[in-house]
């Protein structure tokens, strides 16, 4: 439920029991995160987890600070958990600001060169865009224009990108078709 994948078969059972466990958790880290997410006293749903809890946990990983989430989930001390959880909320806000900044730059690029969105796939790049969020940005560009999108961050002589596709266009096949131009792919 923290990623965009089809939920079926036994995975539905895992999610159901997982949500019940989160709602009734005695883990200080989850309790603090639930409180800081405004979910205290509420039944934790897949929507709550997807849009409030997971982004806070993932934000620090995207910013290169994943040990914070690990510490939050492992601590036995509620005061420490509350402090870490508060920091995760700050870090999530920072991640959102980084995303907004890049999206504004992309909007500016497209306004200056509207032909970028006329191709079958949108490929857009910028200098030193945060690599931890370019996948999220690619998803937003794809949603905005209804086309596959690749967002690339250029760091000196190296460029790293992330793409998102629409149904019916296997983006990974397109990437593999140009693998001779790439140093790495995944």
Language model: regions and residue ranges:
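Hydrophobic helix-and-loop "lid/oligomerization" segment in the mid-to-C-terminal part
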Residues: 1-185
